[in-house]
Amino acid sequence: MVYISNGQVLDGQSRSPWRLSFLTDMFWGITDFVVMFFQSIIHPNVTRRGCQNSSSSTRYDDGRGPPGHPRRMGRINHGSGPSAPPMAGGGGUGR
């Protein structure tokens, strides 16, 4: 990469890729990766910002609460005994 320093055009290729700052950045990058890898195995809810399951970061912060039970569709059927006869006319009490 070309850049200007003190009025001179310098080519970035002349810099060594094994300079000390690169090596320390690489070391800390690998160290952070290894630490976060093992922390995620031991405590899966931990991220770089902290625990994700804290009480302040729940899904229902807006006061609605969790959703209710699913609604029933169709007839109510409790599964006990025969169903009631139809309500059409026919034999009754006046015979």
Curated annotation (Swiss-Prot):
The keyword Nucleotide-binding does not apply. This is Selenoprotein K. It holds the Pfam family SelK_SelG. Belongs to the selenoprotein K family. Keywords: Calcium, Calcium transport, Cell membrane, Endoplasmic reticulum, Ion transport, Membrane, Selenocysteine, Transmembrane, Transmembrane helix, Transport. It is found in: Endoplasmic reticulum membrane; Cell membrane. It comes from the Eukaryota. InterPro entries: Se_SelK/SelG. It is a single-pass membrane protein. One of its GO terms (biological process) is calcium ion transport. Residues 47-95 are annotated as: Disordered. It comes from Xenopus laevis. The chain crosses the membrane at residues 20-42. Required for Ca(2+) flux in immune cells and plays a role in T-cell proliferation and in T-cell and neutrophil migration. Involved in endoplasmic reticulum-associated degradation (ERAD) of soluble glycosylated proteins. Required for cell surface expression of CD36 and involved in macrophage uptake of low-density lipoprotein and in foam cell formation. Required for palmitoylation. GO terms for cellular component: endoplasmic reticulum; endoplasmic reticulum membrane; Golgi apparatus; plasma membrane.
